[in-house]
A protein has these predicted regions:
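Positively charged, structured surface patches that bind polyanionic biopolymers
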Residues: 1-103
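Basic DNA-binding region of bZIP-type proteins
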Residues: 95-125
Length: 128
């Protein structure tokens, strides 16, 4: 799998109070589907941020057959995204966090690959 086609979706994501509030107010499947769609969209963008100008949001809504007002509500009402109104860009702290961990893992793997592969496991000595 290519590196640019992956990110971790944590099992306890549904335990987040903001996610739970969004699902309660907007309907669980619909709200969670749009949230994950936005995460996937951000994952493909440089620095994991995208435009929240009206035209790109309308295009996104049309592509995924979702109401543009629902996208706007999820972006702005549930503290799941950081929206920079001045730059008209948005990002997801969740995605930033999981990608930081994943990118660090990739960096370590690349360094180990240059050294000849996986680091050797240290043998535990038997305690006497």
């Amino acid at each position: 799998m290519k590196k640019d086609q992956y990110f971790n979706l944590e099992v306890n994501l549904l335990n987040d109070d903001n996610i739970a509030g969004m699902m309660l107010e907007l309907g669980a499947a619909n709200a969670l589907g749009v949230y994950v769609m936005l995460l996937l969209h951000l994952r493909t963008k440089e620095n994991y941020e995208a435009s929240c100008r009206p035209l790109p949001l309308k295009a996104l809504a049309k592509r995924y057959d979702v109401d543009v007002d629902l996208i706007g509500r999820i972006l702005r009402e549930f503290d799941l995204f950081e929206v920079d109104e001045e730059r008209q860009m948005f990002r997801a702290p969740y995605l930033d966090r999981v990608m930081k961990t994943l990118e660090e893992k990739w960096r370590i793997n690349a360094e180990n690959g240059k050294k000849g592969g996986r680091p050797r496991k240290t043998k535990k000595r038997a305690e006497t």
